[in-house]
From Swiss-Prot:
<feature type="transmembrane region" description="Helical">
    <location>
        <begin position="423"/>
        <end position="443"/>
    </location>
</feature>
<dbReference type="GO" id="GO:0005886">
    <property type="term" value="C:plasma membrane"/>
</dbReference>
<feature type="binding site" description="axial binding residue">
    <location>
        <position position="418"/>
    </location>
    <ligand>
        <name>heme b 2; high-spin</name>
    </ligand>
</feature>
<keyword id="KW-1133">Transmembrane helix</keyword>
<keyword id="KW-1278">Translocase</keyword>
<feature type="transmembrane region" description="Helical">
    <location>
        <begin position="39"/>
        <end position="59"/>
    </location>
</feature>
<feature type="binding site">
    <location>
        <position position="331"/>
    </location>
    <ligand>
        <name>Cu cation</name>
    </ligand>
</feature>
<keyword id="KW-0472">Membrane</keyword>
<dbReference type="InterPro" id="IPR004677">
    <property type="entry name" value="Cyt_c_oxidase_cbb3_su1"/>
</dbReference>
<dbReference type="InterPro" id="IPR000883">
    <property type="entry name" value="Cyt_C_Oxase_1"/>
</dbReference>
<keyword id="KW-0249">Electron transport</keyword>
<dbReference type="GO" id="GO:0004129">
    <property type="term" value="F:cytochrome-c oxidase activity"/>
</dbReference>
<feature type="transmembrane region" description="Helical">
    <location>
        <begin position="87"/>
        <end position="107"/>
    </location>
</feature>
<comment type="pathway">
    <text>Energy metabolism; oxidative phosphorylation.</text>
</comment>
<dbReference type="InterPro" id="IPR036927">
    <property type="entry name" value="Cyt_c_oxase-like_su1_sf"/>
</dbReference>
<feature type="binding site">
    <location>
        <position position="330"/>
    </location>
    <ligand>
        <name>Cu cation</name>
    </ligand>
</feature>
<feature type="transmembrane region" description="Helical">
    <location>
        <begin position="228"/>
        <end position="248"/>
    </location>
</feature>
Length: 549
């Protein structure tokens, strides 16, 4: 049966988008000419070039349009849209390696400050937000977008909603990362942790994120599967809540429409409260809810076992939604924040122990009857160890929110160790495991190029994590104890520089651990590249039709 022919004319969507990008390019050229500072001029010129490239791609798409529409099904299966997933998977590995490398550089700068080289562009103050944004938002964000687009298609048994919209999301999101990252190197920042991009980058992200939400929702609405799979609940919670947090924390008043500088709309303790309501829930919904969606899809899929308890996943979801959003004030213990607010944040943080560990138990117990696979499947082992790190981090976090513990841990390297046990152990490993699954699926390969390389990656990265977090735990507790030590006369027993000197060996160990983690990521990148290049294609068998009842 022949496929329906396509009219050799641009669609309304293509025409409209081409006009919008052409107008954007024109406005960006004007903005670059009238810019009040060099970074804004650079970003305006970069945006103009990107807009022109977008127009070219849309026009080229028109000229290279095939004679017929792509089939709705291939061998009885929906013809899924894998292009945006492949793009985001590639960008995840690119930004991941870049972010890990920058992390190694700044860890080395803390151990050997001369490595700053007195150059502003590579100083610790500019590279640190570049590292956090590259790892959290560039690496983690691309993993979440790629996996969410894959999971929502497969679990709903329909092609991703929209034609250009998914591509707009993945390319637009990575352009935001490029603007934000180059801005940090040029000294453009709002000085709000995890929310450093200036006003124009925030506006662009808002547009991209709204389209992301619409694509995801539209795919769910047109689903052929009556049930909405649990992973999609967590993805939707992540997308919606991050939108609310972004809009709440980032209102800013630009000094000029042609300058990069702006002032945050909030002030004083209100700004601090908004910032850590955002900052903590960026952890809660970007780095937790989104990656729990990965856990709930990829572990059962890899283990070939159903989720241990669907009822527990429902409890886990709703408890996480209602409790996490209130826990932000524990970042502001012993500050000008009202004491009742600090106590409220501490209370909700402690309550988070229960749903977090419920989710961990659900993930681990999914392997019931398949524990032997941990010996033979390093990808599944990586996914399961990530859940163990999730449990450890979600125990340590509530414990550190208790005021008496926080009085020792706050502002010390213990917090850095806690963050990285979650970031490297939980987010890193579950992302690696997901990409090891996703790349062969998206590129239609029978399997990975080498499971031995996955095994090497697992052990090298695990050793790196253990070195990193152990060094930070010891240095953080030592730091806190030295800061609070007094002589019999009531004077500080140690000067500040003495506490810094005591940290030096631990900073060297941290850099070594980060280096091992980077080596593991490079092994992974090679393995995935070879999987795509030389991996054996998987033959898709037709789906047998179910007999009518």
């Amino acid at each position: 049966m022949s496929q329906p022919s396509i009219s050799k004319s641009m669609t309304i969507g293509e025409s409209g988008l081409a006009v919008v990008f052409a107008a954007t390019a024109f406005l960006c050229v004007i903005a670059a000419a009238k810019a009040l500072d060099a970074p804004f001029a650079f970003h305006a010129a970069l945006s103009a070039a990107a807009s022109v490239a977008a127009v070219f791609c849309i026009v080229n798409r028109y000229f290279e349009r095939p004679a017929a529409l792509p089939p709705a099904e291939i061998n009885g299966r929906p013809n899924y849209n894998m292009g945006p997933i492949k793009f985001s998977s590639f960008m995840a590995m690119f930004w991941g390696i870049a972010g890990f490398l920058v992390g190694l550089i700044i860890a080395s700068q803390l151990a050997w400050p001369a490595l700053n080289f007195d150059l502003p562009w590579i100083s610790f103050g500019r590279l640190r937000p570049l590292h956090t944004s590259a790892v959290i938002f560039a690496f983690g964000g691309n993993v979440l977008i790629a996996t969410s687009f894959y999971v929502v298609q497969k679990s709903c048994r329909v092609r991703l909603a929209g034609d250009l919209a998914p591509w707009f999301v993945v390319v637009g999101y990575n352009f935001f990362i490029l603007v934000a990252g180059t801005g940090y190197l040029l000294g453009v920042t709002q000085s709000k942790e995890y929310a450093e991009p200036e006003w124009y980058a925030d506006l662009w992200l808002t547009i991209v994120w709204v389209v992301y939400l619409l694509v995801f929702l539209a795919t769910i609405i047109k689903r052929k599967e009556p049930h909405i799979f649990v992973a999609n609940w967590f993805y939707l919670a992540f997308i919606v809540t991050i939108a609310v947090l972004h809009l709440g924390n980032n209102p800013a008043l630009p000094v000029s429409a042609f300058g990069s500088k702006s002032y945050v709309a909030w002030g004083g303790i209100q700004d601090a409260m908004f910032q850590w309501w955002y900052g903590h829930n960026a952890v809660g919904f970007f780095l937790t809810a989104g990656f729990l969606a990965i856990m709930y899809y990829f572990i059962p899929k890899r283990a070939e076992r159903p989720i241990y308890s669907y009822r527990l996943s429902i409890i886990h979801f709703w408890a996480l939604i209602f409790l996490y959003i209130w826990a932000g004030p524990h970042h502001l213990h012993y500050t000008a924040l009202p004491d009742w607010t600090q106590t409220l944040g501490m209370t909700f943080s402690i309550m988070l122990w229960m749903p977090s560990w419920g989710g961990m138990i659900n993930g681990l117990m999914t392997l019931s009857g398949a524990w032997d696979k941990l010996r033979t499947d390093p990808v599944l082992r990586m996914l399961v160890v990530s859940v163990a790190f999730y449990g450890m981090s979600t125990f340590e976090g509530p414990m550190m929110s208790i005021k008496v513990v926080n009085s020792l841990s706050h502002y010390t390297d213990w917090t850095i160790g806690h963050v990285h046990s979650g970031a490297l152990g939980w987010v890193g490993f579950v992302s690696f495991g997901a990409l090891y699954c996703l790349v062969p699926w998206a590129w239609n390969r029978k399997g990975l190029y080498s499971l031995k390389l996955v095994n090497w990656h697992f052990w090298v990265a695990t050793l790196g994590i253990v070195l990193y977090i152990s060094a930070m735990w010891v240095s953080g507790i030592l730091q806190g104890l030295m800061w609070r030590a007094y002589t019999s006369l009531g004077f500080l027993e140690y000067s500040f520089i003495e506490t810094v000197e005591a940290m030096h060996p631990f900073y060297i160990i941290r850099a070594a651990g980060g280096g091992l983690f980077l080596i593991g990521a490079l092994i992974m990148a090679y393995n995935l590249w070879m999987t795509v290049r030389v991996g054996e294609a998987e033959v898709q068998m037709p789906v047998a039709l179910q007999p009518a009842e």
